[in-house]
Curated annotation (Swiss-Prot):
UniProt family annotation: Belongs to the OAF family.
Superkingdom, natural source: Eukaryota
Protein name: Out at first protein homolog
Residue stretches in coiled coil: none
Pfam families with a match to the protein in the record: OAF_C, OAF_N
Gene that produces this protein: Oaf
InterPro entries: Oaf (IPR026315), Oaf_C (IPR053897), OAF_N (IPR053894)
Signal peptide annotation: 1-29
Originating species: Mus musculus (Mouse)
Length: 282
């Protein structure tokens, strides 16, 4: 890993055409590389009611050949959220395309990627997901279970050029966030113990230095380093399999899914406040 302080300041990304930002989550699934296997990926489109009563649409795809699941949604403010569960590599990828406020001098969009370890009880297996069938596509659904908020301190950067060694999905999903891909030391240890090369990861400033940095919302100078905060939610996803009992069967059998909603907050170092202009001090 590179020593702390040697990471380049992310350069301004070229403006993403507005047409791409307006694409449906269904079309965005093609960016993930999901479905690269011989079988066509199974897809569900789900309308979901948020806690504030707004309704969004999610696209979920499963590829049992690649052993992966993807989820795409567009938040009411236009932000595009993508999630990949890569079961082969024990990797979760969260990608956010955040629309900028041009009147505030922000760029048209900013991309972030967060990469963490996938635990196999986080979401149902890809094979089970691939067997789900679309029912009542116009029905508005709510998650049966709200899982606890997960707060993650991202203290390691991922080297985009080597990211394919961590997950083959990373190059496609995080292509717009090459200088803003973050993970955690504890997850790095897990992956390197399983053979992932350490060149994939780059050190960020030490935890003590980060602890002393103010939150970006409290910094006035846009050129100063600070600790950025970003939150996202997966509004509806199949988190568990349901099992039923029958007198005719000696053992429980799979008979459905349980849906969950889960929120995440990520804290991470940025070398300039201008890379975190959405983070307003509460």
């Amino acid at each position: 890993m590179r020593p702390p302080g040697c990471r380049d300041v992310p350069s301004a990304r070229p403006a993403l055409p507005l047409l791409l930002l307006l694409l449906s989550p269904l079309l965005l699934g093609a960016l993930h590389g999901v479905g690269a296997g011989s079988g066509a990926p199974a897809e569900l489109r789900v309308r979901v009611r948020l806690p504030d009563s707004q309704v969004i649409e999610e696209s979920l795809q499963a590829d049992s050949d690649a052993d992966s699941i993807s989820l795409d949604l567009r938040k009411p403010d236009g932000t595009l959220i993508s999630f990949i569960a890569d079961f082969k590599k024990d990797v979760k990828i969260f990608r956010a395309l955040i629309l900028g406020e041009l009147e505030k001098g922000q760029s048209q969009f900013q991309a972030l990627c967060f990469v963490t370890r996938l635990h196999h009880n986080d979401i149902i297996p890809s094979e089970a997901m691939a067997k789900l069938r679309q029912k009542n596509p116009r029905a508005v659904r709510q998650a049966e279970e709200v899982r606890g908020l997960e707060q993650l301190h991202m203290d390691i950067a991922v080297n985009f050029s080597q990211g394919g060694l961590l997950s083959p999905h990373l190059h496609n999903v995080c292509a717009e966030a090459t200088d803003a891909i973050y993970t955690r030391q504890e997850d790095v240890q897990f992956w390197t113990e399983r053979g992932v090369d350490s060149s994939v990861f780059e050190a960020l400033p030490k935890a003590l230095e980060q602890a002393e940095l103010p939150r970006c919302g409290r910094v006035g100078d846009r050129g100063k380093p600070c600790t950025c905060h970003y939150s996202l939610s997966l509004a509806w996803y199949p988190c568990m399999l349901k099992y039923c009992h029958s007198r005719d069967r000696p053992a429980p059998y799979k008979c459905g899914i349980r849906s969950c909603r889960k929120s995440y907050t990520f804290d991470f170092y940025v070398p300039q406040k201008q890379l975190c202009l959405w983070d307003e001090d509460p």
